[in-house]
Design a protein with these regions (language model features):
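Short glycine/serine- and acidic-residue-enriched loop/turn motifs that recur at repeat junctions
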Residues: 56-75, 108-125, 159-175, 209-225, ...
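Enriched but not universal
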Residues: 1-58, 397, 401-409
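Conserved core positions of repeat-based scaffolds
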Residues: 57, 95-98, 107, 145-148, ...
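Tandem repeat domain/solenoid detector
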Residues: 85-88, 101-104, 135-138, 151-154, ...
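Surface loop/turn motifs at the tips and blade-to-blade linkers of beta-strand repeat domains
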Residues: 80-81, 130-131, 180-181, 230-231, ...
């Protein structure tokens, strides 16, 4: 007997072992589960983690961003509460929004534009639930706004909307989630500084929000307050945005493993060997083994299917991880490791997890966002403690000044 999950994935009633897998960073070695579960989670539509997850945080604690009931910055990881049912998390500038395994949505930190989604503009230093719904599946944070996909394939947004990044056809900020259109075929979403990229189940790519650097990929620099399609291709897979202080760019991997970038490029963050801005997607090299690309403040970090990590763009704080503070306009490899499982790119720093469930960090560290117990920048990866129980790093955190990661209890 068999059936289908939403999205067309085959459902098996007989258990199959999935292990080791990397659903979205979560290792499930030795866990009995349905086949395709990892792929389902990787698309952001699987609401439950494959293993129990504690949520840990560190870095800039302004406005309660670390969820500790205070505004203290921490240079070493601290746990957010005592729960072990966290599933997904994304960071904004000084805010955090997370999804639990029961599909509920929680938020804390800066709320000046309603980016916590709780109907107010009051900062929260501890997690508060956003509404009572239990169908949240995926989350992505921009500078002071968030977007989320529900299990029914609808897309929602809230927070700051000065460039139309909430996709409402206006520039009004919202302190509670509002639906973007009426479609139910959204698959993946990524957010940059003040813009959004989203892929539908048909593989088409859509963008909206700020566009002064061409970050929407529309061949122009016109802002859009409603979703507009990028070209006519149906082969887009994993979207991500990056940027800070009005310099934004975008990255997306296609289903064939090629990497494409566009937008601001003043420090080589597009990885195309120059510093020329591009308002339409351009391919980064000719390789077909890219897995994911992430953007930050004028820099990018990408992971390949062979487990290597590559970076490009700004590096004045060592965020390229190549042992220098020199900008690079073409991808450079971070060390020689081939065991990177997933990465997260913050404002000017990177967090990476290996297949051995160790956590590493590098780049800017002025408020302890590297989790190393100090505030010294690092230009090469340094291990965060000695634990081997990290099972997932954060998702979207392109504008964040703090960090989060998951541990197995």
């Amino acid at each position: 007997m068999s059936g289908k999950w939403p999205g067309g994935f085959i459902k098996k009633t007989a258990p199959v072992v999935v292990g080791p897998v990397d659903g979205e960073g979560g290792t499930a070695s030795g866990i009995w589960t349905l086949d395709q579960a990892a792929d389902y989670e990787k698309q952001g539509l699987w609401p439950k983690p494959l293993v129990p997850r504690e949520l840990w945080t560190w870095g800039n604690g302004a406005d309660g961003a670390n969820g500790q009931g205070n505004t203290t910055s921490y240079s070493s990881p601290v746990q957010v509460g005592a729960l072990t049912d966290w599933s997904k998390v994304s960071l904004s500038y000084k805010s955090t929004v997370a999804i639990k395994s029961d599909g509920t949505l929680w938020a804390w930190g800066d709320n000046g534009y309603g980016q916590l989604g709780d109907g107010s503009t009051t900062d929260r230093s501890s997690p508060v639930q956003v509404g009572a719904l239990t169908d949240w599946a995926q989350i992505a944070g921009g500078r002071e706004f968030f977007t989320s996909i529900k299990t029914d394939g609808t897309l929602w947004a809230w927070g700051r909307n000065n460039f139309g990044q909430l996709g409402q056809g206006n520039t009004t900020s919202y302190s509670s989630p509002v639906q973007i259109g009426a479609l139910t075929d959204w698959s993946l979403v990524g957010a940059g500084n003040e813009h959004v990229l989203a892929v539908k189940t048909d593989g088409t790519l859509w963008t909206w929000g700020a566009n002064d650097q061409g970050e929407l990929g529309q061949g122009n620099t016109t802002d859009y307050s409603s979703p507009v399609q990028v070209g006519a291709l149906t082969t887009w897979a994993t979207p991500a945005g990056g940027g800070e202080t009005g310099v934004s760019h975008s990255l997306c991997v296609k289903t064939d493993g090629t990497l494409w970038t566009w937008g601001g490029n003043g420090q080589g963050q597009l990885g195309i060997g120059n510093t020329t801005y591009k308002s339409s997607p351009v391919q980064v090299g000719a390789l077909t083994d890219w897995s994911k690309g992430l953007g930050g403040d004028r820099g990018s970090a990408c992971i390949k299917t062979d487990g290597t990590v590559w970076t490009m763009g700004r590096s004045d704080s060592g965020e390229l991880g190549d042992g220098t503070t020199v900008d690079k306009s073409s991808p450079v490899q971070v060390g020689a490791l081939t065991t990177w499982a997933d990465i997260s790119r913050g404002n000017r720093f990177v967090i990476g997890r290996t297949t051995g469930n160790t956590l590493f960090s590098w780049g800017d560290n002025d408020t302890g966002m590297l989790g190393l117990g100090d505030t010294t920048d690092r230009s090469s990866p340094v291990q965060v403690g000695a634990l081997t129980t990290w099972n997932k790093s954060a998702g979207e955190m392109s504008n964040a000044l703090h960090s989060v990661a998951f541990q197995s209890p």
